[in-house]
Every structure is written in C-alpha cells, then in structure tokens.
Amino acid sequence: TGMLMLDRVLYTSTHYPANYGFIPRTYAEDGDPLDVLVLCSEAIYSLALVKCYPIGVISMLDNGAIDDKIIAIPFNDPTYNSYKDISELPRHIFDEMSHFFRVYKQLEGKETAIDEIKDSKAAVKIVEKCIDRYIDYFCKGKPQPEIKAHEEQPAEV
C-alpha cells in the first residue's frame, strides 16, 4: 500500500543500537522479512533503501524460534565501510547489540537469547536463502509454512 505499519513499540527503556529495518523481498524463518541492523554514521529515515553489504549475523532464539539479525554496512559510509566482518567491530559496538537483543523483550514477558554469532559468509548465505524463500512463497505460489512462534501471546503481569 506504500504505507508504514508500526511493528512494535519497545517495552523497555532501551533503544535500538543501530538503524533497524528489513531486507526487502526476503522471507525469514519467523514469517517476516529478514531483519537487518545497519551500522551507519547517520540516522536513516523510514522507507529509505540503503545499499549495504552484510558483515555478519546474530542468530537469536525468540520464544524458542530462530530469528536472524543481519548486521550490515552501507557501501558509502566512510566511518564504517572499512569493516568487512563482524569480528572486526570494536568490542563495545558488538556488546551493545548483544545486550540489546538479550533484554529488549523482557518486559513483554518474552524470552530472547543469542544462539550464535556468524561471519559475513554465513550472513550472505542466510540472505540468499531468505530471497529464495520469498520467491518460492510470493512469486511461485508455494504454500507458506505455519508459523506459530510469531503469534502474539498476552504477557502475564
């Protein structure tokens, strides 16, 4: 429709550690477009398309389901474009991202955990797999799998 839909309001006082969005025309295992954190020296506006390359992936468990977060760098950002792999990031930047994803859903009563940190080659493979999945389900008409982990459950107070 060309309109934005608010996906979530964070329940915690934390904030996203980088520009957070999705990779268009991908379909991840959680039934959503593939998530991406774009490390950039500038804030990026909603609906902006940014040419990036992946440097790694934070593979998470979100209520028991896999939820990959691609970490990417804009080609034209001189502050960050010397980094080619997640292992090259300053430790503090990596620690901020890891901390955020461990706590950002706690007040919703949801459990998240970091399962694995993977390199740029693994990130490229995940992006390619999610592009292929998008083509299968949205271009070729393959039936979509039932995704149960994404259903909203009320939090207990």
Listing of model-derived features with the role each one plays in the protein:
Residues 1-157:
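Hydrophobic N-terminal alpha-helices or hydrophobic patches in metabolic proteins across all domains
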